[in-house]
From Swiss-Prot:
Reported function: ATP-dependent RNA helicase involved nonsense-mediated mRNA decay and ribosome biogenesis through rRNA processing.
Positions annotated to bind ATP: A224, K225, T226, G227, S228, G229, K230, T231
SMART domains: DEXDc, HELICc, WW
Protein name: DEAD-box ATP-dependent RNA helicase 14
Segments of skewed composition (Low complexity): 1-11, 583-622
Sequence ranges of Pro residues compositional bias: 54-67
Family named by the database record: Belongs to the DEAD box helicase family. DDX5/DBP2 subfamily.
Start and end residues of each stretch annotated as Disordered: 1-29, 48-138, 560-708
Motif placement: DEAD box: 333-336
Length: 708
């Protein structure tokens, strides 16, 4: 009986790989008997690593050796000593018990394997492949710092120098050094293979610093701009946890990722499938706007990972069709956006159904007080990783930004110039403020350039079809509302055009962030009109912060009184842009001169026109005596938001001076008595313009859309 157990242990133990004459001496190849992974062992230095060793150049000085340990020809004993060394190195207090457990495990396996196992080292990957040997927690087994040294991987940059170079700051105790190369991560070979086949040569800064923290079972708050590689920053540690725990996926997911929009959710799902395929990790995506039936069937088959929007997940939880009792790894992606959209109650309701002993990772592009509050409530002693300056909104410096100060009738001609200047087939996103304008532009551009529209009124099937054609290049121009500003992760977008300026510089930064992703460069064009002047000051700060040139026209607009209300965007719910609050959506404001982007505005007749032209949306009420009612969609009318938690984000019911209203708003003409248009083309309209407004000659094309 004892001999049979010893034989079984020997069969499962590591063994020498076939001789490889290309390996530099004295390195030897070894094969893990449990997983079949190939790794390498140096009998002289006792180093163990997964990356293939290379002979050091003759002129290079020898790498600094770790403190001298007694040499022992017994690799198994040296491995136990290495395990003890790992326990003494940089492990936080709550992790030391786990390291002691691993060291005991090494010794037990060495004794059970007999004399054969004493001839080859036992790596940490053996414990990762055997879930029963691990403590029952959500921790991932993290590679020790001395197993994959930076010297072995060819990068001798110090952690401090790497952090300074990439503007990484850490808030919290005992944060491990970043993984500056993929070889230093110790990830399983199949995961490394998927990452390298995807074309990544090195971890992004957020990945480099968040991976070692996540693998130590620490909660994380990661503050980084969009396009920084955060998706893999939380997915890969989740994969490693799944491989270790090996829960029954039919009993519920182990990893839960919450996302603000269905576009972002589906893209996270695509990444999970792509990089988890070789590890046989299953995932399901739950989002609104699509039938529940197929999603419920996918859940019944079992899913290791669930990626969900808060609203749809709450619906399914109320149906009792999914259980979260197994979730031990929770991710809140774009947490600031979820709070901005009013999802905080749904998030808290979901978290109540997740076990308290979990690991929570929060990724956000900004760090306002609302995000700080929910982080303090949901996370336990987190390590905060900041990439860049978190005290102010900054744009990606890889994006070249051009701001054209123009009038609304000039937009169409300028857009045509931009599109003609691009290489054929270049992927371009054009952002508009209204759904109707999206459809209008897409129809006008479709024949010559190939364009499609995406916004909240599109069905999920239509959205999927449009995004599929855009990704494939069959339809290289995408016209979108802000629903696509966050969530779209298409790495080869060349140009972003802000046809209409958004309702705040934070949305501007997220819009242009669709280009210049994953280390690439991009170009952003923005049309900036008089009614956008209230954002001029903040826009100049964004441009200067990204080392972009600022036109004299834009500076003149600032000097004439264009302002952004606050030098920083971290405003409370009663004094941020347009009364916008993270928890309460959009508030109602009452003022004579309307200078904010949202709200219900009440003023007197004398200020009606000036206030109207200083806004993009709102309910405008002038002196109703003798007024007629007109409804228009030139800026934004009757626009419901793309998420159910929003109040109507751009909703205009305009009682005003019916005689001069058309001329006051985006006025231009093709015929002197034409005031109604067909929505199938660009709007042509005419009224007698006031003398103090600038107009194009008759026959010029305007861009507003009428909605009678």
């Amino acid at each position: 009986m004892a001999s049979a157990a010893a034989a079984a242990a020997t069969a499962r133990g590591p063994r020498y790989a076939p001789p490889d004459p290309t390996l530099p001496k004295p390195w030897r190849g070894l094969i893990d008997g449990n997983t079949g992974y190939l790794y390498f062992w140096n009998p002289e230095t006792k180093a163990v690593q997964y990356d293939r060793p290379t002979a050091p150049p003759p002129s290079s000085p020898p790498a600094q050796q770790p403190p001298e340990r007694p040499r022992n020809s017994d690799p198994a004993e040296s491995q136990a000593q290495a395990g003890a060394s790992r326990t003494q190195n940089a492990a936080p207090a709550d992790d030391r018990a786990r390291n002691d457990h691993l060291n005991d495990h090494f010794e037990r396996r060495t004794e059970a394997a007999g004399s054969h196992a004493q001839n080859v080292p036992f790596t940490e990957q053996n414990t990762r492949s055997n879930p029963s040997s691990q403590p029952c927690s959500a921790a991932g087994v993290y590679p020790a710092q001395n197993v994959f040294s930076e010297a072995a991987s060819g990068d001798r940059t110090s952690p401090e120098a790497y952090r300074a170079k990439h503007e990484i700051t850490i808030v919290g105790n005992e944060a491990p050094a970043p993984f500056m190369t993929f070889q230093s991560t110790g990830f399983p070979p199949e995961i490394l293979r998927e990452v390298q086949q995807a074309g990544f040569s090195a971890p992004t800064p957020i990945q480099a610093q968040s991976w070692p923290i996540a693998l130590r079972n620490r909660d994380i708050v990661a503050v980084a701009k969009t396009g920084s590689g955060k998706t893999l920053g939380y997915l890969i540690p989740g994969f490693i946890l799944l491989k270790r725990l090996q829960h029954n996926s039919r009993d519920g997911p182990t990893v839960l990722v919450l996302s603000p929009t269905r576009e972002l959710a589906t893209q996270i799902q695509d990444e999970a499938k792509k990089f988890g395929r070789s590890s046989r990790i299953s995932s399901v995506c739950l989002y609104g706007g699509a039938p529940k039936g197929p999603q419920l069937r996918d859940l019944e088959r079992g899913a290791d990972i669930v990626v969900a929007t808060p609203g749809r997940l709450n619906d399914i939880l109320e149906m009792r069709r999914v259980s979260l009792h197994q979730v031990s790894y929770l991710v809140l992606d774009e947490a600031d956006r979820m709070l901005d959209m009013g999802f905080e109650p749904q998030i808290r309701k979901i978290v109540k159904q997740v076990q308290p002993k979990r690991q929570t990772l929060m990724f956000t592009a900004t760090w306002p007080k609302e995000v700080r509050k929910i982080a303090s409530d949901l996370l336990s002693n987190p390590v905060q990783v900041n990439i860049g300056n978190t005290d102010q909104l900054v744009a990606n410096k890889s994006i070249t930004q051009y701001v054209d100060v123009i009038t609304p009738p000039e937009k169409s001609r300028r857009l045509d110039q931009i599109l003609r200047s691009q290489e054929p087939g270049s992927k371009i996103i054009i952002f508009c403020s209204t759904k109707r304008m999206c459809d209008q532009l897409a129809r006008n551009l479709a024949r010559q350039y190939g364009a499609s529209a995406i916004h909240g009124d599109k069905s999920q099937a239509e959205r999927d079809s449009v995004l599929s054609e855009f990704r494939s290049g069959r339809c290289p121009i995408l016209v979108a509302t802000d629903v696509a500003a966050r969530g779209l992760d298409i790495k080869d977008i060349r140009v972003v055009v802000n046809y209409d300026f958004p309702t705040g510089v934070e949305d501007y930064v997220h819009r242009i962030g669709r280009t210049g992703r994953a280390g690439a460069t991009g170009v952003a064009y923005t049309f900036f009109c008089d009614q956008d002047s209230k954002y001029a000051s903040d826009l100049v700060k964004i441009l200067e912060g990204a080392n972009q040139s600022v036109s004299q026209q834009l500076r003149d607009m600032v000097s004439r009184g264009g302002y952004g209300g606050r030098s920083r965007r971290w405003a409370s719910s009663d004094d941020s842009y347009g009364g916008r609050g993270y928890d309460s959506g959009y508030t109602s404001r009452s003022t004579d001169n309307y200078n904010s982007g949202y709200g219900s505005q009440s003023g007197n007749g004398s200020s009606f026109h000036s206030s109207f032209h200083n806004s993009n949306s709102g309910n405008q009420f002038g002196d109703t005596s003798g007024f007629q009612t007109s409804f228009h969609n030139s800026s934004s009318n009757n626009q419901t938001s793309d998420n159910p938690s929003f109040h109507a984000s751009s909703n205009n019911d305009q009682p005003g001076d019916g005689l001069s209203f058309h001329a006051r708003f985006y006025s231009s003409s093709r015929g002197s008595d034409q005031s109604r248009t067909n929505n199938a083309g660009f709007r042509d309209r005419s009224r007698s313009p006031p003398s103090n407004r600038n107009h194009e000659d008759p026959g010029s094309k305007a861009v507003g859309v009428s909605n009678w």
